[in-house]
């Protein structure tokens, strides 16, 4: 059944079903996906609707009812075909050819008001041919965590998928890493693309360069449209993907975010952050911080993220080399570190209050900041928030005024580094007039919100839901994240 034949598709009174759904990926043919059926749930309770995304889809939040979300994204009425995408991937360094959408599917693709194509992908919508013995479901806690991660990262300026909605579905689930039975949910993830590095790796595994080229042409036409008419569009695509991924991981690092599971099947071909599992925001600066309890050797620890993303880009060259020149891809990848460092330095300087500094000043300040954070083990997010909260023009007068009203207390042995940092910050401020001091205060406030999505915050929010069915802390936390308070 094609989209045009979908029952009630164009004439539906449900605004979410009346969107201008496109069949860009479906038109590639069934070498890339399987048609699947959605699970039927005993209950549908709308727990989250992301009204901030609706105007981008040309919808008025006041017009779209809660029941519309449930009908479209909980009961999946009026939408066919539903497509489970096929892909493989390197998981913790080992190739896995048994992957694919195991608990979700591509619900549809929508051209937004900005002209960009967005994918609606489900999570927790039931079994598919790739469920590998799993139930295809999503725990309610898993849904809550993904909503929070996506909103937090988006409002920190990280390029990320967003959660359009989350619906509790009334099924008891059994999990080894949660008290069970636990509650269930289904969610809709709005992302720039459902296609992963692993989508190409699967085609290479089956030795289908024809399908690889067809998919790559599709990716460029839909997500790198500015390159579609270029003679060297393939190598230009790879070069831009390198830049996007390098900048993305720099955004994670500056935000203190650890993705936890950077397998190639969790890497988006558009260079967007998505697929949030056991992620965590670091409590203190520790390059060895591990977010996933099953990452026994720390492969995906916080400090390894840049090198792992670079490695994944290098492994992507294998399926692409049937179309792209290997040497040209290597030349593009060599710029990864340059892109990463430029983005990371820019973001960290903004967290320190500066839109720009001379290279010697910037390098010295960043190096000393990281050294202090590492040795002192003060709260990573607390340090930057305290800078924003206590910043004063008096910091320019004497080094002793810098951070003197903050709650930052270095551990014994780190006070000397902290003194050096205060002296350097004071010295840099001496070069700024009063107008530029005001800009520093504004920059600090914008880039260092009070609310940090640390694990105790998430667990406290979940405890209220699990024990009392109290959702107020969840909504208040999202409000704080969105308002950057």
UniProtKB/Swiss-Prot annotation:
Catalytic activity: L-seryl-[protein] + ATP = 3-O-(5'-adenylyl)-L-seryl-[protein] + diphosphate; L-threonyl-[protein] + ATP = 3-O-(5'-adenylyl)-L-threonyl-[protein] + diphosphate; L-tyrosyl-[protein] + ATP = O-(5'-adenylyl)-L-tyrosyl-[protein] + diphosphate; L-histidyl-[protein] + UTP = N(tele)-(5'-uridylyl)-L-histidyl-[protein] + diphosphate
Annotated Pfam families: SelO
Active site per UniProt: 265
Residues that hold ATP according to the record: 100, 102-103, 123, 135-136, 189, 196, 275
Gene Ontology molecular function, alphabetical: AMPylase activity; ATP binding; magnesium ion binding
Named cofactor requirement(s): Mg(2+); Mn(2+)
EC number: 2.7.7.-, 2.7.7.108
Function: Nucleotidyltransferase involved in the post-translational modification of proteins. It can catalyze the addition of adenosine monophosphate (AMP) or uridine monophosphate (UMP) to a protein, resulting in modifications known as AMPylation and UMPylation.
Family: Belongs to the SELO family.
HAMAP family: YdiU_SelO
Name the UniProt record assigns to this protein: Protein nucleotidyltransferase YdiU
Organism field: Nostoc punctiforme (strain ATCC 29133 / PCC 73102)
